[in-house]
Amino acid sequence: MHWGVGFASSRPCVVDLSWNQSISFFGWWAGSEEPFSFYGDIIAFPLQDYGGIMAGLGSDPWWKKTLYLTGGALLAAAAYLLHELLVIRKQQELDSKDAIILHQFARPNNGVPSLSPFCLKMETYLRMADLPYQNYFGGKLSAQGKMPWIEYNNEKVSGTEFIIDFLEEKLGVNLNKSLGPHERAVSRAVTKMVEEHFYWTLAYCQWVDNLNETRKMLSLSGGGPFSNLLRWVVCHITKGIVKREMHGHGIGRFSEEEIYMLMEKDMRSLAGLLGDKKYIMGPKLSTLDATVFGHLAQAMWTLPGTRPERLIKGELINLAMYCERIRRKFWPEWHHDDDNTIYESEESSEGSKTHTPMLDFSFYSRTETFEDEGAENSFSRTPDTDFTGHSLFDSDVEMDDYTDHEQCK
């Protein structure tokens, strides 16, 4: 049996197969916030009825070859149009009237909410601000080519900074209410360090130096029997894009050792700023915590065995405890069980230590999920120890009352 394979995408792209067999995609690449994105479908169709013809394809005249290729392209286009109609129908089912619809990448395979620091930042912010929302994992980028983006009352906003400004204006929430002018200035400066500098060092570790592990975590739909091939293609395309964008940024012009040195300086700066405080700016939550958590969580849970993971779970243990506090407080369905933080569900035995898939609520509201937060916590777990032999919970990790959230109402 012979198979025909095609790639269908609504975004223009050019495939460059040069002498070194590199592959480059252009046209859908847009900006520093979430550069790695891939949208389209791998479509396969059987050609079993034309086995004899396909066997003799090499000797057929050019017009027959053209006919076969055109037929395959038409089949791919028809399948893609059907997919688009289904997507449109699904989108029509999403009612954004007085509801926040968060568009983001699909959940990865390792139980972490997102491999994207910006998607994790945005979803964590919505939970911190106690704003009910609905996830949509369609994979489609915003009009500006960004991910994540939201819909609210038929308005579409992309870019996490603009999304937060929009929600503050429309819904009156403000996680920075307790910050003074000086603290707000410090918060913005740290945000830019994390998103415009530390982010690129993480991207290098995730999509260049640790690509094979990242590929295992990547979740793709629509690939069918070609899922593994599609995952490999997406990861290597992303690797090339990240390296090219890092070079344009300037940080990619340094050696691997120098990039990791810059990463370590950023992480040490965050650890020094946090100190023994509960949150980055003090005892109260702020928008900065969503930003920092979205990025540190990548080092904590998506980069096994790498330098940033060893650093955060070893020497900079206060950052690990900070991540655990936020994870346990705002992500009750996120149970991560690796060598350092083991959380077992009430139904599971001590021997079962497998990744628990993320549970996606159709609509998430913290007031519904954390109704017993003041009492003994039902999802507290038994921790393991870090690389130094200290428990990740040697510091304050208990759950707060809702006083943390009164500031954003």
From Swiss-Prot:
Q: Where are the transmembrane segments?
A: 68-88
Q: How does it sit in the membrane?
A: Single-pass membrane protein
Q: Where is this region: Disordered?
A: 372-393
Which GO cellular component terms are attached?
Answer: membrane
Report any Pfam family annotated for this entry.
Answer: GST_N_4
What family name appears in the similarity comment?
Answer: Belongs to the FAX family.
PANTHER family given in the database record: FAILED AXON CONNECTIONS HOMOLOG, METAXIN RELATED
| Name of the protein in its database record | Failed axon connections homolog
Which species is this UniProt entry from? Mus musculus (Mouse)
Gene designation per UniProt: Faxc
